Amino acid sequence: MKPVIKNIDSFSNPILGTKDGVPTVVSLYHDHAPGESSKHHSHPWEHQVYITSGSGIVWVDGEEFSIKQGDFILVPPNSTHHFKNTGDGMLSRITFNPKESEEYL
């Protein structure tokens, strides 16, 4: 396997995945404008989320957690969850999923 380098300003989701030769992890990038939320959903895999900028709230199985730039979040498998930007600037995050998630994208 060879290294793959992509710039955040010129990519499409997934950032990195099996099409790039990555065998186990799919990386996705999401931006949320102030007041915007992601879709409330669940899936059978856990995933990790890194907040690259902004602040907001993540709901996981009905429980609310404040999030901000620099936070790393583990969302358990089969949990219902969504993110909401409660700040004044953009809420940006990178999500790391197992490769099985790619078929749902």
Predicted features along the sequence, with ranges:
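A short, N-terminal "cap"/entry segment at the start of jelly-roll beta-barrel domains
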Residues: M1-V25
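Short histidine-centered beta-strand/loop micro-motifs
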Residues: L16-K19, S37-H43, K84-T86, L105
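Conserved short histidine dyad/triad with adjacent acidic residue
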Residues: S27-H43, P77
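Short, conserved beta-strand element in jelly-roll/cupin
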Residues: D31-H32, H43-V58
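Structural motif
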Residues: Q48, S55-I57, E64, T80, ...
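Short acidic-glycine-tyrosine-enriched beta hairpin
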Residues: G62-P77
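Ligand-binding loop in jelly-roll beta-barrel domains
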Residues: P77-E103
